[in-house]
Amino acid sequence: MTDAAAVIERVRQRVDPTPAERRALAAAASRLTERAEAAIAELPVAADVVQVGSTARGTWVAGDRDIDLFVRFPSDLPREQLETYGTTVGAAVLPDGHEEYAEHPYVTGTFEGYAVDLVPCYDVAAATEIKSAVDRTPFHTTYLQEHLDDGLAADVRLCKQFLKGIGVYGSDLRTQGFSGYLCELLVVEYGGFEAMLAAIEDWQPPVVIDPAAHQQASFDDPLVVVDPTDPERNVAAVVSAANVATVQHHARRFRATPSEDAFTPASPAPLDAAALRSHIDRRDTTPLAVVLDAPDVVADQLYPQLYRSRDGVVRGLREHGFDVVRAAAWADERAVVFVELASAELPAVERHVGPPVSVGTHAERFYETYADDDGVYGPFVDDDGRYVVERDRDVRTAGGFARTELGTVALGARIESRVASGDYDVYVGDAVVEALLPEFESELAAYVDPKA
Amino acid sequence: MTDAAAVIERVRQRVDPTPAERRALAAAASRLTERAEAAIAELPVAADVVQVGSTARGTWVAGDRDIDLFVRFPSDLPREQLETYGTTVGAAVLPDGHEEYAEHPYVTGTFEGYAVDLVPCYDVAAATEIKSAVDRTPFHTTYLQEHLDDGLAADVRLCKQFLKGIGVYGSDLRTQGFSGYLCELLVVEYGGFEAMLAAIEDWQPPVVIDPAAHQQASFDDPLVVVDPTDPERNVAAVVSAANVATVQHHARRFRATPSEDAFTPASPAPLDAAALRSHIDRRDTTPLAVVLDAPDVVADQLYPQLYRSRDGVVRGLREHGFDVVRAAAWADERAVVFVELASAELPAVERHVGPPVSVGTHAERFYETYADDDGVYGPFVDDDGRYVVERDRDVRTAGGFARTELGTVALGARIESRVASGDYDVYVGDAVVEALLPEFESELAAYVDPKA
């Protein structure tokens, strides 16, 4: 047995559900389906029940206890009735459940220890004719049931555990990683987990995979996996370039040096104040933190806004002449944009380059603007023949930037409104330590020990 | 009379030689020519004497007292004999003169208060057949005598005084400005001084002027004036882009607001230590000076080496992460590369971006280099999917850079050898003040009051 095979065998023992687990889940799903069918029989409309998701496909990782049931209504049913009937069936199946809302309401609850979602959808003829995103899901299950066998399903479990271990599993907008469906398609595409790793090692982004050979749209993403049920959809649309690279890195590492580590999420020891101070001293940088109460929105809204804000703050600082070493954004009770700067203070003057002297009116206007201004050095002519002045900076400190200029940078909507009302705090240098610990002790631990 | 005409009239009174000055100069030139012809008569070879330069063309500025005589020998005369005969004639004409050496020796001395150069050259059929650069000069004089009249010659004097006033007169490699011959061609081309200013105001570099409409080479210069005596030569080759822009700036200023100031070189009051410190405080920058004894070479060798060294030091500092606000290079007894920095100190770590993870062997090698190095942060993967480490900087201070890294940057040859032997000093911050004053008090005065 190769090293890789031995490692994989040990991982299989962790991720493969036991026969008892399978039987229990199948029995629970069956009882739920019967309940749903009984409720449907009471309705003045025909509908059927399909089990979807990883537990329908046999690709769930041992210990996962999610059952997803979709109730398919005729596609000509008005939306309000679909919602009403769906809620009615949901309440009958999960009397202790509650409604949640995606594109339309669905019912979520627990049943015999399983987390159950009961989702109404339209029974359309093809995934390309869907009326709502959830209508597509049954087609995914059908496609995979046709293409997966027990061996591939087991390899999907390995793949999921691998991606969890390296921190890129999940198509939520915080992770920007790989969905379960994407794992399934990749394992099917390459014919197994190890073959998939071998293929990933050679990826040259942008990578395009089209299992059904029917791509009809072009995608500007580092990884494109055309949905076999919809030629215009990239299943990997949310996967970031960094996560594509991370998978590639770990595929290469695992193949060179197989280890169970890749299948185990890192959990760095939380960082205490002394350790954080020691890193800041060692790096001799200046940290800046913009801190606010986390906006009360779901994670898939919060994180894109937070990342956009981080990028906006970094861009703004750079445009003002600050040298950013690294930046991050985190959320817990509070949300934080954390920026590490080479220096938190700039000279009093900045070089302001104007137009080439040769551009006539425009150049003349620049010259006239500054010619009689005793507060600037110049205008003079640079080596390229452009007018230049050295003028006083508006903003000389990173803290000053964060306190007065955040309104000028691109921020996420809910963060922008907080900033507009001054409802945020700015910390610079050592003050950052007390401000962020212990709330962000895990995030800071990862920050000071960054890994591929 | 327009404002411009009134200003120009006053300048003419300063720059036009008086009839007495003209007569005296013509008489002196005539006597020198007779002496030279007498000496030639003693030689076993035929030759003639031509007066060249601005005093031959009537374009000299009042007070200039230069007479240039060229002795033209047959083009088949061996070079050693040309040199011997030239020196013989020179010694006869200027018994108190001494030899200098350009492409070949010539004699320079004084005669009745005039500075006289007596230069041997070959009498070739056309400027394109020259054997040495000086052979071209008589053709320039012939061309201009055909194209200049008294009015244009007077406007050439205005042009020269204007370019002197704004600091761009002289084709030496320190100034990188306009030669007298170039002034003459421009005034002829545009038909007068004011017409020239009007044309310059509209220049869109690169500007190409070809008086004889015979250009045969292409030139990568911001200003091209094809020599009417040589289709492959750009008379304006040494003029820098900055000087083209400077002329354009002042042409525009003069036409908008005529003033005699443009015809008067600026002479800023020398800067004392208190004033320099006050500027440094006000700008809140850190000055750095690399100082050495000026290499003992002529200015046309020294300044290109000095400018190259300045550019090399600036590039090196930037490559090491320093933010350079402005830089300069000056020479007197000592030579100095002066650099003004936003900050003289950088963080302990620097971001070192490696290859994209996807590039296989190259990426793997980068990862392996740092994977087990406890001294770095990372390797991790950046947003673009590249490996990154944050590693300790080799050089954290600008002074350290100047003391240990100058050998790694492009320097002028004679400065490079000084640096190689450690024969230079580095000053940072306030120490620069005492180190550079009073020797560079004028240069520093101009530096802290930069003008177009």
Curated annotation (Swiss-Prot), chains A, B:
It is an enzyme of class 2 (transferase). Its EC number is 2.7.7.72. It comes from the Archaea. InterPro entries: CAA_C (IPR048833), CCA-adding_arc (IPR008229), CCA_tRNA_nucleotrans_2 (IPR042090), NT_2-5OAS_ClassI-CCAase (IPR006116), NT_sf (IPR043519), NuclTrfase_I-like_C (IPR011068), Polymerase_NTP_transf_dom (IPR002934), tRNA_NucTransf2 (IPR015329). CDD domains: NT_2-5OAS_ClassI-CCAase (cd05400). Keywords: ATP-binding, Magnesium, Metal-binding, Nucleotide-binding, Nucleotidyltransferase, RNA repair, RNA-binding, Transferase, tRNA processing. It catalyses: a tRNA precursor + 2 CTP + ATP = a tRNA with a 3' CCA end + 3 diphosphate; a tRNA with a 3' CCA end + 2 CTP + ATP = a tRNA with a 3' CCACCA end + 3 diphosphate. ATP binds at residues 54, 57, 140, 160, 169. Its cofactor is Mg(2+). CTP binds at residues 54, 57, 140, 160, 169. Mg(2+) binds at residues 66, 68, 117. One of its GO terms (biological process) is RNA repair. GO terms for molecular function: ATP binding; CCA tRNA nucleotidyltransferase activity; magnesium ion binding; tRNA binding. A single active site specifically recognizes both ATP and CTP and is responsible for their addition. Belongs to the tRNA nucleotidyltransferase/poly(A) polymerase family. Archaeal CCA-adding enzyme subfamily. Catalyzes the addition and repair of the essential 3'-terminal CCA sequence in tRNAs without using a nucleic acid template. Adds these three nucleotides in the order of C, C, and A to the tRNA nucleotide-73, using CTP and ATP as substrates and producing inorganic pyrophosphate. tRNA 3'-terminal CCA addition is required both for tRNA processing and repair. Also involved in tRNA surveillance by mediating tandem CCA addition to generate a CCACCA at the 3' terminus of unstable tRNAs. While stable tRNAs receive only 3'-terminal CCA, unstable tRNAs are marked with CCACCA and rapidly degraded. HAMAP family: CCA_arch. Homodimer. This is CCA-adding enzyme.
